[in-house]
UniProtKB/Swiss-Prot annotation:
Listed name of the protein: Adenylate kinase
Record's subunit section: Monomer.
EC category: transferase
HAMAP family: Adenylate_kinase_Adk
Annotated source species: Burkholderia ambifaria (strain MC40-6)
Keyword annotations of the record: ATP-binding, Cytoplasm, Kinase, Nucleotide biosynthesis, Nucleotide-binding, Transferase
Region (LID): 122-159
Purpose: Catalyzes the reversible transfer of the terminal phosphate group between ATP and AMP. Plays an important role in cellular energy homeostasis and in adenine nucleotide metabolism.
Domain notes: Consists of three domains, a large central CORE domain and two small peripheral domains, NMPbind and LID, which undergo movements during catalysis. The LID domain closes over the site of phosphoryl transfer upon ATP binding. Assembling and dissambling the active center during each catalytic cycle provides an effective means to prevent ATP hydrolysis.
Any GO BP annotation: AMP salvage
Lineage: Bacteria, Pseudomonadati, Pseudomonadota, Betaproteobacteria, Burkholderiales
Annotated Gene3D superfamilies: P-loop containing nucleotide triphosphate hydrolases (3.40.50.300)
Length: 220
């Protein structure tokens, strides 16, 4: 099982990726995880990427593709893989195709932008522990305070409404065209000896379990 998960930031791709990788026994290749690790390590790549991420912009293709090419060499990718957050652009999708990276399915999780803004801008974090809350869906017992320590909660820069909206604008311009790209390729069929992936679209609204079942049904 080799697949790509598509959807806007905050659509729930990460949650569903966990279910899919467990069901099919494949690794999740998340460029977000790779980037966060690089940022945490303070590597040159991480420092450069952090500037883009804090501004709500996409990290350039050259930085991402270098990470992904290294990851695909690992032995656990031999029987399949799940791309979460990659490709983000047509150029990256073309680079994958040129490299002969086989994909069986492209699964889009569709969530209205208004819902995403509410989901993401409502997040609050306790910096010391990493505990997360949501002002509407998972509020702390005392507003603005961590349940365990009583210390103040913060809103991360990349969860602020203006940053979320900026990320969605970038997604609309750079990543959403992939929906057409893969949909058209699925209709055309095999190209350059590479089998076209099957394209599937599901709603990302509802409970986590409901969305999981939709995803599993789409990948049968």
């Amino acid at each position: 099982m080799r697949l790509i998960l598509l959807g806007a930031p905050g659509a729930g791709k990460g949650t569903q990726a966990n279910f899919i990788k467990e069901k099919f026994g494949i690794p999740q290749i998340s460029t977000g995880d790779m980037l966060r690790a690089a940022v945490k390590a303070g590597s040159p790549l991480g420092v450069e990427a952090k500037g883009y991420m804090d501004a709500g912009k996409l990290v350039p293709d050259a930085l991402i593709i270098g990470l992904v090419k290294e990851r695909l060499k690992d032995a656990d990718c031999a029987n399949g893989y799940l791309f979460d957050g990659f490709p983000r652009t047509i150029a990256q999708a073309d680079a994958m195709k040129d490299a002969g990276v086989a994909i069986d399915y492209v699964l889009e999780i569709d969530v209205p932008f208004s819902e995403i803004v509410e989901r993401m801008s409502g997040r609050r974090t306790h910096p010391a522990s990493g505990r997360t809350y949501h002002v509407k869906f998972n509020p702390p017992k005392v507003e603005g305070k961590d349940d365990v320590t009583g210390e103040p909660l913060i809103q991360r820069d990349d969860d602020k409404e203006e940053t979320v909206k900026k990320r969605l604008e970038v997604y609309e311009a750079q990543t959403k065209p992939l929906i057409t790209y893969y949909g058209d390729w699925a209709k055309r069929g095999e190209e350059n000896g590479l089998k076209a992936p099957q394209y599937r679209k599901i709603s990302g609204l509802g409970t986590v379990d409901e969305i999981r079942e939709r995803a599993f049904d789409a990948l049968k």
